[in-house]
UniProtKB/Swiss-Prot annotation:
Lineage of the species this protein comes from: Bacteria, Pseudomonadati, Bacteroidota, Bacteroidia, Bacteroidales
Role of this protein: This is one of the proteins that binds to the 5S RNA in the ribosome where it forms part of the central protuberance.
CDD domains: Ribosomal_L25_TL5_CTC
GO BP of this protein: translation
A GO CC term assigned to this protein in UniProt: cytosolic large ribosomal subunit
Gene assigned in the entry: rplY
UniProt family annotation: Belongs to the bacterial ribosomal protein bL25 family. CTC subfamily.
Matches recorded under PANTHER family: RIBOSOMAL PROTEIN L25/GLN-TRNA SYNTHETASE, ANTI-CODON-BINDING DOMAIN-CONTAINING PROTEIN, RIBOSOMAL PROTEIN L25_GLN-TRNA SYNTHETASE, ANTI-CODON-BINDING DOMAIN-CONTAINING PROTEIN
Oligomer and partners: Part of the 50S ribosomal subunit; part of the 5S rRNA/L5/L18/L25 subcomplex. Contacts the 5S rRNA. Binds to the 5S rRNA independently of L5 and L18.
Domain of life: Bacteria
Keywords, ordered alphabetically: Ribonucleoprotein, Ribosomal protein, RNA-binding, rRNA-binding
HAMAP family xrefs: Ribosomal_bL25_CTC
Organism: Bacteroides thetaiotaomicron (strain ATCC 29148 / DSM 2079 / JCM 5827 / CCUG 10774 / NCTC 10582 / VPI-5482 / E50)
Protein name stated in the entry: Large ribosomal subunit protein bL25
């Protein structure tokens, strides 16, 4: 898995919630994003610039994040992100510190491979799930999950329960559809003509 470096500055938490809300508003006003690092027994509050998160957030790839908080380096993953409901700005980010001995849960992008039989027959291949949630040690998690669809016929689907990847436990619902070959009008017309 690729890694990306993010630099942050530690911050203290105000005792009263009104002071904390004011402080967070000031951070966002100055182009910063409040962040929290969980794991390893302690919770660390820090601030990162909006630009510092851009390459991590606005990408289809997954990364191990090399966090540098005031010189202290930690490996983490992006756990949660909150956006402003109207402006779509990043409001808050949660990171989770990686423990090399414990498995982590992460969403991994899906890549389809091959030309489906149903597409050759006039159907349309539709990717229903862009990411699948997996559980594994972080050094086993791949950058993407490749699903071969060359066997997929018209009207057929691939479900999460039908997939298996070495060293990964699939957490997503087993009945969730990953991809399907849907009938197009042209394919329905050809099937009706062949049936006459």
């Amino acid at each position: 898995m690729k890694s990306i470096e993010v630099k942050g500055t530690a911050r203290t938490i105000a005792e009263r919630s009104s002071e904390q809300a004011r402080a967070l508003k000031e951070i966002r006003k100055n182009g910063g994003v409040p962040c929290v690092l969980y794991g390893a027994g302690e919770v660390v509050h820090f601030t990162v610039t909006n630009e510092g998160l851009r390459n991590l957030v606005y990408t289809p790839h997954i990364y191990v994040v090399d966090l540098d908080i005031d010189g202290k380096k930690v490996n983490a993953i992006l756990k949660d992100i909150q956006f402003h409901p109207v402006k779509d700005n990043i409001l808050h980010v949660d990171f989770y510190q990686i423990d090399e001995a414990k498995p982590i849960v992460m969403e991994v992008p899906v890549q389809l491979e091959g030309l489906a039989e149903g597409v050759k027959a006039g159907g349309k291949l539709a990717l229903q799930m862009r990411k699948i949630k997996v559980k594994a040690l972080y050094n086993v998690i791949p950058e993407k999950l490749t699903v071969n669809v060359s066997h997929l016929g018209l009207g057929k689907t691939v479900k999460v329960g039908e997939l298996s990847f070495e060293g990964l436990e699939l957490i997503s619902a087993k009945e969730a559809v990953v991809c399907a070959v849907k009938l197009t009008r042209a394919a329905r017309g050809a099937a009706a003509a062949a049936g006459k």
